[in-house]
Amino acid sequence: MTHLIETFTSVLHQSALKPSRLIVAFSGGVDSRVLLELAAQYAQTHGIECCAVHVHHGLSKNADLWAEQCQTWCDALSVSLAVERVSLDINCGESVEKLARDARYQAFQQHIRQGDVLVTGQHIDDQLETFLLALKRGSGPKGLSSMAKVMSFGEAFIVRPLLSVTRLDIEASAHDMGLTWVEDESNQDLRFDRNFIRHQVTPTLTERWPSFRESVCRSAQLCAEQESLLDELLESHLQQALGGCNSKSNSKSNSKSQSLSIDSLSQHSDLLRARLIRMWLSHCNQPMPSQKQLKLIWDEVACAQADANPKLVLNDVEIRRFNNQLYLVQDTKDLSSWKSEILIDENLLLPDGLGEIHLKAVSSGSASHNRDVQRFSLTKANGTLRVIFNPEGVSAHPVGRGHSRKLKKLFQEYQVPSWLRRRTPILMDGDRVIAVLGLFVDKNYEGQDCEALWSK
């Protein structure tokens, strides 16, 4: 126990993090059982809070018993425990291992605050398995880097303080401390790749080469260092290729990050261009694409015909092109049929997380100084005020323009990306456009007695 608490403390101190809370990823297995003891002791010594999160996957008939047992152990240490129940769609085509892992980290995210540290119980044997799985998939240096000892996690951090410790060492410490733990029967199922490596591959390799674990971890560390160095050397190229949203619309874009200049990318070699796209996706917290997907991003999206509206679905987002820029866009609902009345001095909540519209009458001299506010007059209004998202067949005459045009053409002129054109609210007076929020006011409603603010 003494050497493990020293290892635990050393890793946290070397990370230079000063958490106000430790959150323990607590499955109840031997690794996390020892981790809980270490975290509770560290928290008590350093005067910080220690909490735990147990994820109930519902995959085992024993899952309820495990949750109850975890609660008992946490109570004995005065550690608060949150039990998160998740459901997995095991028929979606993804491996159960990946589904469970993704669900766990989504559950952990629900309990993380800024400045927290989530500690997890992975050890050197887990690192070896992760490396071999990446090798089996044909991963490059990034995948072969395996698990980092410290990594960002939203506004918090994940720390793996036992990554240099063997599974046998953890089990020996658990026995020395007189601990009990749960045994997940699925860990013996050789249909799962990680279990196959653990029970069939690793013993043979380590019997032949006793230091094989340490050698693999050294290779993983070297891969991580090379990746970090390459990112550092190419950061200036990425910054040159990155751009802000070129759209003049203030619409909520649902873009995950800045856009990427196709002109800038085209100046580089195939290898460098692919690397910059990977770096961009990494900055957007997206899983790394395969080589085939990278080629599709460039060939079928970036290099599509000028009049095309190309897109590529990548995981749960879309890669889109607009104004010779690549965008990462969240999958969104079709709001074409959505409409709602709105009253003066009332707020209207928009669908699909698009914020709300504040509409109010203003007297002379009391207008808002907020630059996002649009001012107009309703003295000529004679219809029902409503908000719609469907621009089909609708025309408007923006203030300062010589004539009216279809909204479809105006959206193009105002450089609104195609995926936002049915997500930009249109304020209507009956069948006439008063304003397109974030873009313009119609000439027929020019004035200062009313103002609208679209808060995203």
From Swiss-Prot:
Its EC number is 6.3.4.19. Signal peptide: none annotated. It comes from Vibrio atlanticus (strain LGP32) (Vibrio splendidus (strain Mel32)). Keywords: ATP-binding, Cytoplasm, Ligase, Nucleotide-binding, tRNA processing. Gene3D superfamilies: 1.20.59.20, HUPs (3.40.50.620). Belongs to the tRNA(Ile)-lysidine synthase family. InterPro entries: Lysidine-tRNA-synth_C (IPR012796), Rossmann-like_a/b/a_fold (IPR014729), TilS/TtcA_N (IPR011063), tRNA_Ile_lys_synt (IPR012094), tRNA_Ile_lys_synt_N (IPR012795), tRNA_Ile_lys_synt_subst-bd (IPR015262). The N-terminal region contains the highly conserved SGGXDS motif, predicted to be a P-loop motif involved in ATP binding. Ligates lysine onto the cytidine present at position 34 of the AUA codon-specific tRNA(Ile) that contains the anticodon CAU, in an ATP-dependent manner. Cytidine is converted to lysidine, thus changing the amino acid specificity of the tRNA from methionine to isoleucine. One of its GO terms (biological process) is tRNA modification. Its main location: cytoplasm. The gene is tilS. It is found in: Cytoplasm. It is an enzyme of class 6 (ligase). ATP binds at residues 27-32. This is tRNA(Ile)-lysidine synthase. PANTHER family: TRNA(ILE)-LYSIDINE SYNTHASE-RELATED. GO terms for cellular component: cytoplasm. SMART domains: TilS_C. It catalyses: cytidine(34) in tRNA(Ile2) + L-lysine + ATP = lysidine(34) in tRNA(Ile2) + AMP + diphosphate + H(+).
